[in-house]
Amino acid sequence: MNLSATILLAFGMSMDAFAASIGKGATLHKPKFSEAVRTGLIFGVIETLTPLVGWGLGMLASQFVLEWNHWIAFILLVFLGGRMIVEGVRGDSDEACDAPRRHGFWLLVTTAFATSLDAMAVGVGLAFLQVSIVTTALAIGCATFLMSTLGIMVGRFIGPLLGKRAEILGGIVLIGIGSEILWSHFAG
């Protein structure tokens, strides 16, 4: 996977966390930058670890499906992207409608884990491709840190307007990356 695809994947994977952070920021009255950074760090670390776990699980099965790797990555990314789009359109969310005014550590960890399950599944798909999983996981984690921190800070202003659109955009990006993987296999 080239650098631009890695960056697109990283920011595509961060959109769930961004949407969740907007929701979190929307429930806080004038959140401090330190709260935004704390949230970003929690989301970023978890989002870095989950693709590594998924990659490890995928490697266990790689000898059985190497000839199908492009299809596996494509199907996983289209499924995850489609799910994000459907959730964005329907208005479903991992976030509770009446989120607390103060966000405790375990609430943030639980939310971060819930939004990072997609990254774990992507990690499984990446096990079948020739990618640097550490570089990709770090890119996903850094993008998630940035987007989650930003989401908290602007959440109270744009939460009602952009929250679900961020999930839709993330889903479109994932489907695009899956299509690019499949196209690259057949084109070259």
Curated annotation (Swiss-Prot):
Lineage top rank: taxon: Bacteria
GO cellular component: plasma membrane
Transmembrane segment boundaries: 3-23, 41-61, 62-82, 107-129, 143-163, 168-188
Keyword Nucleotidyltransferase: no
Xref: Pfam families: Mntp
GO molecular function, one term: manganese ion transmembrane transporter activity
Swiss-Prot/TrEMBL keywords: Cell inner membrane, Cell membrane, Ion transport, Manganese, Membrane, Transmembrane, Transmembrane helix, Transport
Disulfides per UniProt: none
Subcellular localization(s) per the UniProt record: Cell inner membrane
Protein's membrane topology: Multi-pass membrane protein
Chief location of this protein within or outside the cell: membrane
InterPro entries, sorted: Mntp/YtaF, Put_MntP
Function: Probably functions as a manganese efflux pump.
Stated family: Belongs to the MntP (TC 9.B.29) family.
Record HAMAP family: MntP_pump
Name of the molecule in the record: Putative manganese efflux pump MntP
